Amino acid sequence: MTLQELVLRTASVYMDRTAVCFDEGNNQPPVCYSYKALLSAASELSHFLIAHCDFGGIREIGLYCQPGINLPSWILGILQVPAAYAPIDPDSPPSLSTYFMKKCDLKYVLVEKQQLSKFKSSHETVLNYDTVSVEHKDLALFRLHWEDGRVSTVLGDRADQHKVTDREDRVSAESRTPEKEHMDMRHDGCLAYVLHTSGTTGTPKIVRVPHACILPNIQHFRSLFDITQEDILFLASPLTFDPSVVEIFVSLSSGACLLIVPTSVKVLPSKLADILFSRHRVTVLQATPTLLRRFGSELIKSTVLSAHTSLRVLALGGEAFPSLTILKSWRGKGNRTQIFNIYGITEVSSWATFYRIPEEILNSAVKHESPVQLGSPLLGTVIEVRDQNGSPVLEGTGQVFLGGKNRVCFLDDEMTVPLGTMRATGDFVTVKDGEIFFLGRKDSQIKRHGKRLNIALVQQVAEELRQVESCAVTWYNQERLILFIVSKVDLVKDCIFKELQKHLPAHALPDDMVLIDTLPFTCHGKVDVSELNKIYLDYISSQPRNELHGKEELWGKLQYLWKSILCLPEDPEDTLKVPANSVFLDSGGDSLKSMRLLSEIERLTGTAIPGLLEVILSSSLLDVYNHIVQAVFTPEDRKANRSYTTKRKFSDADPEEASGKPARLESAWPSNHAGETNSVIALSRGSQVLSLGAGRLLTQLGLCLPVCSLDLIPQTNTQILKSLSPPAPDENLEKPPLFQQGSPVVGAMAMALRERWRSDTGKCVDASPLLVRAAVQDKPSTTVYIGSHSHTVKAVDLSSGETRWEQLLGDRIESSACVSKCGNFIVVGCYNGLVYVLKSNSGEKYWTFTTEDAVKSSPAVDPTTGLIYVGSHDQHAYALDIYEKKCVWKLNCEGALFSSPCVSLSPHHLYCATLGGLLLALNPASGSTVWKRSCGKPLFSSPRCYQQYICIGCVDGSLLCFTHSGEQVWRFAAGGPIFSSPCVSAAEQEIFFGSHDCFIYCCSKEGHLRWKFETTARVYATPFAFSNHPRSDDALLAAASTDGKLWVLESRSGELRSVYELPGEVFSSPVVWESMLVIGCRNNYIYCLDLLCGDKNNQV
C-alpha cells in the first residue's frame, strides 16, 4: 500500500465532495477542488512527468512552490509516476536549497511558474540547468546538470566533515548486524518523499521516507482522531516539515476537506483565527505549541478553545508540550476539544507517540505540577529509553530511541537500512512508574554555575506567571541565560525577577530579560532561537552607555542594585538605606546572586572591574563602593581597566578600533616598507615554526625557538638555543567570573594549566592562532593573530592579553593566518572568497585578492620567494605576490581546497590536498603539476613534510605517507576519520595526530603505532609538540578534543600530564610558546593558559 493508493481508494467513494480549499484571506470566496478534479489534475501531471523524465535510477522530483490550491494534486501527480517528491521552500536560504538538491542529486525540479524568477536568481550562480521545452499548466520542469558531481557549498563542506561518524552515532549497534533483513530504497516505488532536517543543531540531514514508514501514522491518526468526510483539517505545516504529510493524507484518505492558506496569513493571528474557526469551521488542528501561542491567550480562550469552537481535535507536537497549568488557562468554560500530546522526529518520520489529556485533568481545579507524559507508541512504532552505555532504562533518565520493523528512513547516503533500526533522538526523558516524561533536547541540558539545568524549566515557570503571555529562553553564546517575554501588561523587570526567585533555584535564574512584542518562529512553526539571539544582540547594542555623573550617583544606584538582587523590602520613597557595613553573604546573598550583582555593576559602569567579585563576596557594601570608585573614577585605573576589558559587548567600541586602526597601542614594531624585512619568528598549529631574518632577534634575545618540528625553517636559521623564562602574569589581569572559566579536571598529574587571559571575539573561534615574535625597539614582543566567525581578525599581546588591534572583514573567518616574509603583513582567508593582506602592526587593509568561493584554507608563505599560497573552495590553488599585488598563477585542483598548502624547501615543492581526495605536488614558481595521487576520500587534513616524506590524514581513517616523488610508502589505519593534520616531533622520529575515534595517536616515521591515548570526544584539532623548558629533555604534546578538553601528554609515552576543560567546543588547534598555550573556543573566546609544573607557581 502507498500514500497515493490510499487516496485513490477513498476518492472513488467521495468523487463529488470537496477535497481541497484554498483561502487567500482577502475576503474573496475560497477556491475549492473536488476529489474528482484533484485526481484528474494529478493524473495529467503524472503523464506529463512520465513523458518528459528519464530517471535511470532512484526516482525523486523536486517541488519548488508556495502553498496553493494545486499543491495536493502536484504531490499526488509525482507519487503516481511513481516517484518521491522532494519539497523545496522558495523562502529558504539558497545555500540550504542548493545543498538539499545537490545532496539528493535531483535531476528534475518542478517549479511553480509564479516562482520561476526567484528560482533562477537564487540558483543561477551554482547550478547549470536547462528548462525542458514543454511546460505543464502552472509548472515548469527543470532538468539539473551537476558539474562533475560537485557543487561547493558551505553546508556541503560541513556535512562532508561530519557525515562519516554521525550516522554511526545515531544508529544503534544491534541494527548493524549482518543477519538483519534490510529495506532497500532503490526498489521501485519504495520512497514517498525526501526532506531535510532543520539543521538548527548541526548539519541538515537528508531523510528519505518510504511509504511503509509513514503509512502506519496515517492509518493510526485516522482512527485515533475519528476522521470522517465531514471533517475539515488545516494544513498548518510547510511541505518541508514532515507533519504536513500527516495533515494532507489523513484528510485526503478520509474523504475530508483540506484547508490551505498562504504563508503570509499564518503570521496574522486574528485573521488566521477568523479563517479557521469562523469562515471554515476547522475541526482538526495539528500544530506546534509556538503556533498556538501566537494566537495569544485571550484569542485561544475566546475562539480556538471556546465552548462553541468547531475544533474537535487539537494535537500539539514538534516542541515541548505546554504545562497543564497553562493548558487549562487557555480553555474556555465548557470547551470539549480533545487535546493530544504527540511526539516524534523527522528521522523516523513523522510521529512516534501520542497521549490524550484526560478530560478530568483538564476540568480539575487542582494544580498539576508534573509534566505531560509522552504516552503510547503509535502503530508499528517501538520506543526505548537507554542510558549513556546503551542499556535499557526502566526507572530514571535516559535518551529516547525510536524505530520499528518498517518505521525506518534512509539518512543521508544510506541505501539500505536494517528493518527495526532504532535511531537516537537526542531527546532526554525520565521514566517513572512506566510512564515517559520529556525533559528536553540534549542541547537544552546545560551546566550553569556548576549545576545541571534544563532551560525548559525556566520557560515553564516564567510562562505560568500571570503577567506573561508567552516566553522563550536561550543560552546565549553558551554563557548567558536570557528570558524573552511577551507580556499581557506593562512589566517591570525587577518584579518578574522577584517572582522567578520564588519558584526557581538560584542557578536557574536568568541573567537578563528582554521584552518583545511577539515570539519569532521558523517556517516549521517552532521558536526561532537564532532570531532570538539576534534580537538580544540588537538589544545589547541599543543599550545606552551608562555614564555615572559622580560618586553620589554611584552610591544611590549601588544601593538600588543591592536591594533589588537581595529582594530586600521595597521602599517607594527610598528612605530605607542599606547600611554601609552590610555584607552581601550575610544579607541573603550567595555566589550566584553575586554574579548577577557583578554583571549589573559592570553594565552600570560600562566596563569590567578587576577583583570586584571577591570584594562583593568578602567585604561590606562600602568596600564594594570604594573598589568601584577606585576603578572607575581614577583616570590611571580607568585606563588600565579598559585595556583588560573582556566584556566588550557591554561597552561601546572604540571608533578607531572598529575601523581597524590601532587602538590604545603604538605600532607593534617599526613600520617598514613592504620590501624591508623585520626579524620575526612565527609559530602556528602542528608545531610549525617559521624563522625569517631572525638572526639579529635571536642574538638580542639570547635564545631560540622552542623544541619543535622545523620543516619550514631555512637551515641557515636553525640553531640550538636556551630556554626562555616567560614573563610573569600581569597582576592587574583579573580572572573572569568562575562560571565562564574553563576548569581543570580532577586527576591532573604533575602539571596544571591556569588561565592567564582570555579575549572575547564576539563569535565562535574555529581558526588556530598564529604567534609572531618580533623585536620592537630592541625589546622582544609576541603577538597572537586569529580570526573568528564574528568577521573580525584580532591581534592580541601574548603576555598581557591586551588587544592591539581588531579588523572587521567581510564574512566569517575559519582560515588561520600566516605572516609575510618581510614580517609586515598578516594574510588570512575569508568566507566571502577574499584573501586579505593586513598590516601586522595596525590591521589596516593593504590588499585583497578575490577568489570565486569561500577561503577556509590557511595561507602559507614561501620563505625563499615570499609568495603566498592559498586554496579556495572554487577548486583553485593560488600563488600571490602581495608586494606587487598580483596573482602569479592559479591552478584548478579538481576539487575544493579546505586544507592548507605545505611548502617543502628540499625539493622545492608545494603540496595541496582537495575534498575530492587528491594530493598534488606543484612547482611553486609556475603552478605546474609535478604529480598527483588519489587518496579515495576527502582530505580535510593538511599535508606535512618531514625528512624525505610527506604525510596526510584522510577521512577514511588512514594516515598516508608518500615520497617527494609521489610513491606511497605506508598507510596507517586509525579507528575513525582523520581531520587533524599531522604534527612531527623535533627529531622527526614521531608523527602525532588526532582522529574522530576519540584517540590521539603517535606513529613512528615508518608508520608503526608507538602509542595512542583515548580522550573523551573526537579530536579534530592538530596536536602541538613542545618541550618542558625547565627540563629540556621532557618532551610534551598538547592536543584538544571537540568537547573543550585540552590534553597535555608525555610525547614519548602518551602518559597524561594534565587536562583542562574549556567552556565550549574546540575545533581550533593549540599553539605553545614558552609556557603559554593559546587556543580558540566556540564560546567566542581566545584563551591563553599558563602551563604550571609541580609547584603551581613554577611554570613549565
UniProtKB/Swiss-Prot annotation:
Domain (Carrier) ranges: 552-632
Transmembrane segments: none
GO biological process: amino acid activation for nonribosomal peptide biosynthetic process; beta-alanine metabolic process; fatty acid metabolic process
Induction of its expression: Has been shown to be up-regulated by a lysine-rich diet. However, levels of expression have also been shown not to be significantly changed even when diets differ markedly in PQQ and lysine content.
Domain of life from the UniProt record: Eukaryota
Effect of S591A: Abolishes incorporation of beta-alanine
GO MF annotation, one: ATP binding
Disordered: region residues: 162-181, 643-671
InterPro entries the record matches: AASDH_AMP (IPR048005), ACP-like_sf (IPR036736), AMP-bd_C_sf (IPR045851), AMP-binding_CS (IPR020845), AMP-dep_synth/lig_dom (IPR000873), ANL_N_sf (IPR042099), Beta-ala_Activ/Resist (IPR052091), PP-bd_ACP (IPR009081)
The protein's Enzyme Commission number: 6.2.1.-
Stored PROSITE patterns: AMP_BINDING, CARRIER, PHOSPHOPANTETHEINE
Residues bearing PTM O-(pantetheine 4'-phosphoryl)serine: S591
Sequence positions bearing Phosphoserine: S651
Chain residues that bind ATP: T197, S198, G199, T200, T201, G202, T203, P204, K205, D427, R441, K526
Function, in words: Covalently binds beta-alanine in an ATP-dependent manner to form a thioester bond with its phosphopantetheine group and transfers it to an as yet unknown acceptor via an amide bond. May be required for a post-translational protein modification or for post-transcriptional modification of an RNA.
Similarity comment: Belongs to the ATP-dependent AMP-binding enzyme family.
Protein name: Beta-alanine-activating enzyme
Organism: Mus musculus (Mouse)
Lineage, highest ranks first: Eukaryota, Metazoa, Chordata, Craniata, Vertebrata
